[in-house]
A protein has these predicted regions:
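Charged, terminal alpha-helix-loop-beta segments
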Residues: 1-125
């Protein structure tokens, strides 16, 4: 995650879920013989976290992926796949969000067809 994207992920967690706890660079899928590791820019949990703790089955979470550019197919794919990867861990994904610097209305309409997937535009303070 770049320094811009870190700032964007933290902004989203702080403004939308101030009572949640952001776990940055969350490992949703470790590297294996036939797959690469998959990191989420952020996972927001609502129980006090331990340092890089594992998610608890049944726990409600919000998954965050950030890109310092306009909403596009790459970020949309990350939002959808991130939701599915984290759900495989047995948690309840309330929302999977892509944070971007500019909205693309056509792409956002496509993203909204997928349950629990949304995009928001980063507003620097």
């Amino acid at each position: 995650m770049s320094k811009h994207e870190t700032k964007m992920t933290r902004w989203y967690a702080k403004t939308r879920y101030p009572k949640g706890f952001l776990m940055e660079e969350y490992l949703a899928l470790p590297r294996g013989k036939t797959n690469g590791k998959r990191l989420m820019d952020g996972v927001i949990v609502f129980r006090k976290p331990f340092v890089k703790r594992k998610l608890i089955k049944g726990e409600r979470v919000v998954v965050v992926q950030s890109k310092h550019r306009r909403l596009g197919m790459g970020l949309i794919g990350q939002v959808i796949v991130s939701r599915d990867l984290v759900e495989r861990l047995g948690v309840k994904v309330m929302k999977s969000v892509g944070v971007c610097t500019e909205m693309d209305t056509v792409m956002h309409r496509m993203l909204r067809k997928h349950p629990k997937c949304r995009a928001v535009v980063y507003r620097a303070a």
